[in-house]
Every structure is written in structure tokens, then in C-alpha cells.
Amino acid sequence: MKERALQLVRESAPEARRNVLREYLQSHVLFSLQAGRAFEQLAFVGGTALRFLYALRRYSEDLDFSLERPAGYRFQRFLDRTERDLMNAGFDVTMHPCEADPMHSAFIRFPGLLHEAELSPHRTAKLSIKIEIDTRPPSGAGLEATVIDQHFLLALQHHDLPSLMAGKLHALLTRPYAKGRDIYDLLWYLSRPEPVSPNVLLLRNALAQTDWAGAQVTALSWRAVIERRLHEIDSTSAADDVGPFLESPEERALLTRKNVLAALRQGRK
């Protein structure tokens, strides 16, 4: 399995190699979680879910989940299974978990792998993947199950697209700093050939849970709320954040306030 990861790196364009390696490892972690029956309790969410399930054209760093069925949930059990599977596949692995309330997280680190893949001159360089599980997610999400072939055959429970969009809008409205990844993902949602609208119930519950002080969001007002937020963001610096993760680096030039506002307003017609 490790040799397959290194082969993928060798076959990739130089600028994509670190992302390709990370994505293979993400797939391996998802496969281990699936084998441990994690998706009976967890739903896959966030940017990596968008990439794996809906072919988002940007790479992502973290694996994010929502705990939908808490009965019998034990975070450490999933980590133990994942660590064992990765080590059996030939990877050196260290786990660094944190079970703070309400977010359970763990950094899975792969010491020496970047050097072995000729992506770093330093033997001690570490590639890491962060797993994060929201153990008290807001209510109202729609759930779906999808089977995909992403290096491994994966059967994933996940939030549906309107609920994933609600999660993205919540991040955009509540982060203390702007992430270019949020802007890119918003533009992706707004420019889809098949229109998608956010799960407003989930968005409202998420905003209430994080004590958001803005006006109540509705199916009619969410675009205006997002438009106000976009005027607060420095789109140039935000675009710098997402550049290294884009499949097509030239898309970075599209991440302007003008373009995002145009897509946002177009949906009102």
C-alpha cells in the first residue's frame, strides 16, 4: 500500500505531488474508518467530503465528521483501527488525539514519508492529516449514503449537498479570518449547473449554537447576509490561501469579490 502511494507521487506533476500523497492517505483513513463501521455513527462533512463525493477541483487537508448516532461511540476505537491498518500497509504512523468537548480530533502523522517520497530533503519532515469529529452537531442535517471508488471502494454516509453548503456558509460567516478555501467553495456552489440552496434550518441551528450575533437567516435572506460578509473580506489575501490546493492554479485569478458577488446575485433571478 505504501508503494502504491509512492508510485502515485512519482506519476504526478511536481506541483501536485504533496496533495496527491495526502489524498491517498485520506482515502486510506476513510477505508479504515469504514472497516471499523464508523459510518454507522458518523457523517462525512467539510471540504474533503465535497472533493471526494462531488469532484470539487481543489485538494483539502482535513477529514471532518459529524456524530449523528452517539450510542456506543468511542473515538479511540476508531483511531486504534486506523493506526493498525496504516502500519500494516507499511506506513510509520504516530497518533496525537484530543477529546475536548465538543470536538474530538487527532493528528495522524507520517514521519519520514515526505523524505521517502522525495518531497522534502529533511528526514524528520512529517506529513499529517487531521481528523475532527463534532460530537454535538447542530440538528437538521440531511443524510445520504454514497459509494465511490477513490483508491479504495468506499461506502460513505455524509451530509447531503444542501447541508454541506449550510456548513460552508456557517464557516464563512463565523470564522474570525477569511479562508480562500471558503470563497472558492462558495463560488463552486453558486456556479453549479444544477442550482443548490443551503439547508437553512441547519444553518440557523449552527449559527445559534455558536452565538452568532447577526440577523436571522432565511431562505430569502441568506444571499444578502453572505453579500455583506463578502464586503468585509480581503479577497486578494484569501485567494493566496487556496492557491496551493487548486488542481488548476489559474482558477485562483477567478476568486475576486466581483466574480463571487456576480454569482451570488445571479441566483436571485
Q: Which ranges hold each PLM region?
A:
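Structured mid-to-C-terminal alpha-helical surface segments
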Residues: 1-43, 53, 69-269
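Short glycine-biased active-site loop of nucleotidyltransferases that positions the nucleotide triphosphate
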Residues: 51-59
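Glycine-rich active-site/cofactor-binding loop and its immediate structural neighborhood
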Residues: 66
